[in-house]
């Protein structure tokens, strides 16, 4: 009997010592299980760009969503910052928003923590251009939303524009011609300027390098989002352009500390495919949704 027990113990220890990690696909399936079952969620797209209502200098923005008004209408950085300084959404109620999602049968919420304008909807030590330090509102909307989501068992994910940032020095800019904005009499000169400046229209945007921006703003803010608000379900990147392979790898290494976080395919293409695809402006086929 002792010999049998000894053999069993030896086999058990051998299995423990030589056990291999789960196959990558199985790990992916395990992480994605809740996402596949959830099927229905809320994407909250909100920031100080809403103050313009799609109108600049009396002209309607000619193309695109309101969140693109700063770029398409070429609003100077100082002017946009001054407008953002008045952002004061005193009627915001995280509890109401989360319950609206829950009562509709939604299982998760994705919130725009920072869109391309560079304004952080959370308290950030990496940039003063945030809702707590820069506005009379003085409240951390992401914190309030995270607490309400935990209370009502709704998963929370963060949209974060990692490359484009039009107000923090060095942030990326995608070139849009003035014809997409408004009838500016200096449109030709502005278009020439953006052609020569990587899409930027304000000298403040080119006062630092993109690497400086990632080092001082984007990567520190990503760390803040991952550490300050409890369990994060999703990181929803946007604009996979100009970011270097090395920078994307650094962000991915940070994400490795949080294996539960699901990511999309917009960090850097094609090297960093993420967990699911994000077709836009069309109804996708099933094969176009997940890698």
Model region roles, listed by residue range:
Residues 20-291:
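Mature catalytic domains of secreted/periplasmic carbohydrate-active enzymes
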């Amino acid at each position: 009997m002792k010999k049998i027990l000894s053999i069993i113990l030896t086999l058990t220890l051998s299995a423990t010592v030589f056990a291999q990690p789960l196959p990558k696909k199985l790990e992916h399936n395990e992480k994605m299980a809740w996402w596949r079952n959830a099927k229905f969620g809320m994407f909250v797209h909100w920031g100080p760009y809403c103050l313009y209502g799609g109108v600049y200098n009396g002209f309607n923005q000619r193309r695109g969503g309101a969140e693109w008004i700063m770029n398409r209408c070429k609003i100077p950085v100082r002017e946009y910052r001054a407008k953002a300084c008045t952002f004061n959404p005193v009627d915001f109620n995280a509890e109401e928003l989360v319950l609206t999602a829950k009562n509709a049968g939604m299982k998760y919420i994705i919130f725009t923590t920072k869109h391309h304008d560079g304004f952080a909807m959370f308290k950030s030590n990496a940039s003063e251009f945030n809702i707590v330090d820069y506005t009379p509102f003085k409240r951390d909307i992401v914190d309030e939303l995270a607490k309400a989501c935990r209370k009502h068992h709704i998963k929370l994910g963060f949209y974060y524009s990692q490359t484009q940032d039009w107000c923090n020095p060095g942030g990326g800019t995608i070139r849009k011609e003035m014809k997409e904005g408004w009838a500016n009499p200096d449109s030709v000169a502005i278009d020439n300027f953006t052609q020569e400046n990587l899409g930027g229209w304000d000298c403040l945007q080119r006062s630092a390098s993109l690497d400086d921006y990632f080092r001082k703003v984007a990567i520190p803010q990503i760390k803040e989002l991952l550490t300050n608000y409890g369990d994060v379900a999703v990181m929803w990147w946007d604009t996979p352009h100009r970011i270097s392979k090395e920078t994307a790898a650094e962000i991915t290494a940070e994400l490795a500390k949080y294996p539960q976080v699901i990511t999309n395919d917009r960090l850097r293409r094609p090297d960093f495919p993420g967990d699911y695809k994000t077709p836009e402006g069309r109804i996708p086929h099933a094969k176009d949704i997940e890698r």
